[in-house]
Amino acid sequence: MFRFFVIKKWLLWSWIGSFVILTSLWVQVKIDVEINKWFGEFYDMIQKALSKPNSITIEEYWESLFSFISLAGLYVSVYVIISFFTAHFLFRWRAAMVEWYHSVYERASKIEGAAQRVQEDTIKFSRIMESLGTSLIESIMVLIQFIPILLGLSVGIPIFFFGDWQYGLISGALIWTLGGTIFLIALGWILRLVGVEYDLQKKEAAYRKVLVLGEDNLEKTNPTIVNNLYDGVRKIHYKMYFHYLYFNAAKWSYLQGMVIVPYIALAPTIITGAVTLGFVQQISRAFGRVESSLQYLVRSWPIIVELISVRRRLLEFERQIEINDNR
């Protein structure tokens, strides 16, 4: 799966492409930091205007809005361009995988589900990596940028439960997000989400194989066998829906609770009127960005489960090819 980074033909795309993607993601995060700063200044201006009529000019108001438009426009431009580039980058990654599979397909074609591995799983791998990989890197970069901002903003203000401790906001975010993440990972393990996804793909592959064989020779498509295979597919799908019912109930209850966490943390500060509206917006947004990054596993868990399942199938496929070569 990772020959893309060692094959000479793809070295330029793999390494230079990775550098371009990482650099652009870093630029996006830096723009996000500036947008967060803008929110603080804009809401302070709004508070000033509402508390004292005509305390700001219409020119100052429009200038602030145009400042946001320029930042948002730059962010969108970078995002669109790098999304286009990332799609090409990951298709090249898929091409590197597929080319190797093509070179050994004469030996691999006898392995059950070989066609699905080469065509379907490689495209799944590239599409999942496009969303999952970039969001992971961006989450790490957001933490690097926003944790110092959150620490700076929390100096000298009282935080619920932690008091005036400088690291109160960060500690609260870590306790809530990591605690929830660990709980949901444990729940996913108890519910065997990865195992169920893997079993589902195996059942679907067996069912598809019989149908494909039947296209060329109807005698090989015994109605009893087809019905039994589809019955297995139906049962594993129902099992997966049932397991995700519990997981989604826990996941979305937790994520909805996260909405009010920054306001709970800032309750003593807000009640005493120790800060401005702009400060509250700036700190709650920074808190939310840190929370969102720490919740990467929670928000991406279903996709992570699918990626693990795809990787497991591809590794098993490559292992079967090696076994056939050694015979």
Label the model's feature ranges:
Residues 1-35, 41-68, 82, 86, ...:
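Membrane-integrated ABC transporters
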Residues 7-31, 51-92, 162-186, 277-291:
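Transmembrane-helix motif of ABC transporter permease domains
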Residues 31-40, 44-47, 71-110, 130, ...:
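Juxtamembrane helix-loop junctions of ABC transporter transmembrane domains
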Residues 124, 200-207, 211-257, 261, ...:
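An intracellular "coupling" helix at the cytosolic face of ABC transporter transmembrane type-1 domains
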Residues 94-111, 189-232, 291-298, 307-319:
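Short cytosolic helices in intracellular loops of multi-pass membrane proteins
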Residues 122-171, 258:
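Hydrophobic alpha-helical transmembrane segments of ABC transporter permease domains
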Residues 152-178, 243-311:
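Helix-loop-helix
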Residues 15-31, 35, 66-78, 135-151, ...:
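Hydrophobic alpha-helical transmembrane segments of multi-pass integral membrane proteins
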